[in-house]
């Protein structure tokens, strides 16, 4: 068996070394407005916390804890109008950091009320909680009294750790320790809140698998809700575009449609007295009769001869005979057969009268009403 050279021994060990996979721990940092959440996270990371802006909404802070874990902390605003979004983060984190503002009695009471609302949420139960009392004015306090005010029951959470954080004294102004991990900085500075925070992370690492299952389930549900909301917005946009296109098509069809004609009124009802009157179709008018007046008609002859075509021409009106006394009671309607208003030529062969004579005979035989 050949021995390995020193070169192969060194480089083979480096190549076959198992890479360290850092697991992620997600935390949520909550508290009322101006409670000192961002200040605490800056100091925990080893950065200067001065000249900070007020957090509106939320911000994400990332830091390395040790060689095994790295931290992602959601710094959520604490104004009354923003506290409604706190519940959106409870299920998606492994643990809770809650900062209590102990500057005045009013801020302390408000912080305790917000804490009660937070711990009553079912997604917060069975998760580790780190309570940090931010004593900016260095007031005296009793740990037992404050713990009783929180009213957090034993066994309701995995573990509840309590610590306090006094006003920043500027010890990080000239120290560049931001490159250190949280664990290394805690061993170096040995502050009480850092030691309690390390215990808080250790409790999460002990139950990491169980807590991660809940976080993954919440993240999956969040992605499903986001996809559903995205699909709903897409469908709404498609509906708006479809309605707009439909309105454009309707406008074009209305523009190309011919104008609507007004309805034609129906004919008035006919007179029942004239129901017995029969209008016959007139034959084509001849040139010989084109000059006959239009009010002259030809009646059916009763006593005249067929050779006399002008003997029975009458005006189109009712009879002019005097009414007898016997006819006052019963009035008969004469039946008149109307024909076209022109003169027909004689039926006998040959013309016995000229055109002018026929017209003259018609005019002489007209009955003028008295």
Swiss-Prot record:
This is ADP-ribosylation factor-like protein 13B. It is a lipid-anchor. Gene3D superfamilies: P-loop containing nucleotide triphosphate hydrolases. Specifically expressed in ciliated sensory neurons throughout development in both hermaphrodites. Its main location: membrane. Sumoylation regulates the targeting of membrane sensory receptors to the cilium. Residues 366-369 are annotated as: RVVP region. It is found in: Cell projection, Cilium membrane. Disruption phenotype: Shortened cilia with various ultrastructural deformities and a disrupted association between IFT subcomplexes A and B. Residues 255-331 are annotated as: Disordered. A lipid is attached at residues 12-15 (S-palmitoyl cysteine). The lineage of its organism: Eukaryota, Metazoa, Ecdysozoa, Nematoda, Chromadorea. Belongs to the small GTPase superfamily. Arf family. The RVVP region and palmitoylation sites are required for compartmentalization inside cilium to prevent distal cilium and nuclear targeting. GO terms for cellular component: ciliary inversin compartment; ciliary membrane; cilium; leading edge of dendritic growth cone; microvillus membrane; non-motile cilium. It comes from the Eukaryota. InterPro entries: Ciliary_GTPase (IPR051995), P-loop_NTPase (IPR027417), Small_GTPase_ARF/SAR (IPR006689). GO terms for biological process: cilium assembly; intraciliary transport; non-motile cilium assembly; receptor localization to non-motile cilium; sensory perception of chemical stimulus. GTP binds at residues 31-38, 75-79, 134-137. Changing residue 331 to R: Decreaed sumoylation. Abolishes sumoylation. Residues 259-271 have a biased composition (Pro residues). There is a cross-link at residues 239, 331 (Glycyl lysine isopeptide (Lys-Gly) (interchain with G-Cter in SUMO)). Residues 287-303, 314-328 have a biased composition (Polar residues). One of its GO terms (molecular function) is GTP binding. Cilium-specific protein required to control the microtubule-based, ciliary axoneme structure. Required for normal sensory cilium function. May act by maintaining the association between IFT subcomplexes A and B. It comes from Caenorhabditis elegans. Monomer.
């Amino acid at each position: 068996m050949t021995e390995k050279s020193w070169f192969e021994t060194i480089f083979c060990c480096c190549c076959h070394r198992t890479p360290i996979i850092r697991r992620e721990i997600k935390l949520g940092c909550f508290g009322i407005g101006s409670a000192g959440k961002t200040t605490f996270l800056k100091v925990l990371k080893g950065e200067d916390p001065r000249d900070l802006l007020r957090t509106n909404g939320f911000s994400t802070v990332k830091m390395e804890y040790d060689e095994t874990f790295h931290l992602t902390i959601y710094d959520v605003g604490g104004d009354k109008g923003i506290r409604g979004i706190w519940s959106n983060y409870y299920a998606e984190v492994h643990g809770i950091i809650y900062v209590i503002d102990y500057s005045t009695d009013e801020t302390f009471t408000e912080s305790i009320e917000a804490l009660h609302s937070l711990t009553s949420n079912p997604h917060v139960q069975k998760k580790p909680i780190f309570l940090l009392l931010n004593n900016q004015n260095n007031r005296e306090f009793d740990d037992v009294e404050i713990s009783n005010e929180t009213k957090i029951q034993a066994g309701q959470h995995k573990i509840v750790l309590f610590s306090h954080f006094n006003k920043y004294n500027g010890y990080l102004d000239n120290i560049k320790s931001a490159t250190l991990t949280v664990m290394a900085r805690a061993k170096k500075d040995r502050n009480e809140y850092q030691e309690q925070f390390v215990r808080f992370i250790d409790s999460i690492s002990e139950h990491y698998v169980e807590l991660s299952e809940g976080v993954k389930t919440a993240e999956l549900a969040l992605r499903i809700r986001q996809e559903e909301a995205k699909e709903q917005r897409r469908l709404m946009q498609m509906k708006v575009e479809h309605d707009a296109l439909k309105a454009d098509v309707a406008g074009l069809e209305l523009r190309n449609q011919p104008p609507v004609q007004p309805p034609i009124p129906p004919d008035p009802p006919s007179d029942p007295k004239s129901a017995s009157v029969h209008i016959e179709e007139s034959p084509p008018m001849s040139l010989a009769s084109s000059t006959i007046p239009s009010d002259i008609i030809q009646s059916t002859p009763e006593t005249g001869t067929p050779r006399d075509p002008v003997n029975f021409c009458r005006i189109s009106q009712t009879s002019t005979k005097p009414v007898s006394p016997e006819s006052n009671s019963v009035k008969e309607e004469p039946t008149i057969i109307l024909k076209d208003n022109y003169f027909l030529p004689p039926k006998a062969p040959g013309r016995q009268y000229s055109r002018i004579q026929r017209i003259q005979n018609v005019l002489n035989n007209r009955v003028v009403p008295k």
